Amino acid sequence: MTVHTAAEKAYILSEALPYIQRFYDKTIVIKYGGNAMTERHLMEAFAKDVVLLKLVGMNPVVVHGGGPQIAGLLQRIGKQSEFIQGMRVTDEETLDVVEMVLGGLVNQDIVTLINKHGGRAVGLTGKDGNFIHAKKMLVKSKEKADEMLDIGQVGEITGIDPEIIQVLDARDFIPVVAPLGTDAEGNAYNINADVAAGKIAGVLQAEKVIFMTNTPGVLDKDKKLLTGLTPREISDLIADDTISGGMIPKVGYAVDAVNSGVKTAHIIDGRVEHALLLEVLTPEGVGTLIKRS
């Protein structure tokens, strides 16, 4: 390593100092998904990022999805995946697969990677400690305005008890949450990971909630990244079709989070190696930051 290269690295580290100081002992909820969960080098980079955030005094909470892995296992057992309005129809057999993949395979893979890089991760689902309360979600029919569709064991969050997360944080563990919930009768529900991350961040009054996606962030009509937005600006961008398609629910979850007391929400590109550190510890960031004003 040359002196010049060493000096560049030292400068980068010193640039992170004000952010380390600002976010010390703050909670950062990270929705982990997309390519960052399926490409091994990105998975390793993500685990290192989470461990580093913890080591410099922040409290990361990871909430993960697992759609591709669920689809892969369903295909292997010969079961067709069915979606209604973007949501997976979850019958009993599908729920068994969802619980196996989210609560077992994917969750433990993330835990193992974080621990491999020096963290102390603990895997759990929303059923553990009964901390994610849910009820059956019904979806409005597009054909009949007054008809509600039953899509199986897909859940709508009715409440979150944050105690188990707070206990783990206080003991310097890193919670890794699979988005499964339960009702008073013990019925299990598959829950959208973006929704779960936003709700958990709101209940914890987190400093940040970060949604890792397969896009750079929110783009304008010229496909240029919009680095900062408010809820009102987002409404205007939806109205003029700048924000459309799958980005609409994503920004909706981000707006819900900041309206519930989360300081800032971020939509970042999980395909960028070390995107998490770049968003939290640099002045430029790598995605779109959303805050109330």
Curated annotation (Swiss-Prot):
Residues given in the record as substrate binding sites: G66, G67, R88, N190
Keyword Oxidoreductase: no
E.C. number: 2.7.2.8
Compartments where found: Cytoplasm
Highest taxon in the source lineage: Bacteria
GO biological process entries: arginine biosynthetic process via ornithine; L-arginine biosynthetic process
The entry's keywords: Amino-acid biosynthesis, Arginine biosynthesis, ATP-binding, Cytoplasm, Kinase, Nucleotide-binding, Transferase
Catalytic activity: N-acetyl-L-glutamate + ATP = N-acetyl-L-glutamyl 5-phosphate + ADP
Site-annotated residues for Transition state stabilizer: K31, K250
Enzyme class: transferase
Molecular functions (GO terms): acetylglutamate kinase activity; ATP binding
Pfam families: AA_kinase
Any one GO cellular component localisation term in the record: cytoplasm
NCBIfam families, A to Z: argB
Family statement drawn from the similarity comment of this UniProt entry: Belongs to the acetylglutamate kinase family. ArgB subfamily.
HAMAP family (UniProt xref): ArgB
Protein function: Catalyzes the ATP-dependent phosphorylation of N-acetyl-L-glutamate.
Protein name (Swiss-Prot/TrEMBL): Acetylglutamate kinase
Organism annotation: Thiobacillus denitrificans (strain ATCC 25259 / T1)
Highest classification ranks of the organism: Bacteria, Pseudomonadati, Pseudomonadota, Betaproteobacteria, Nitrosomonadales
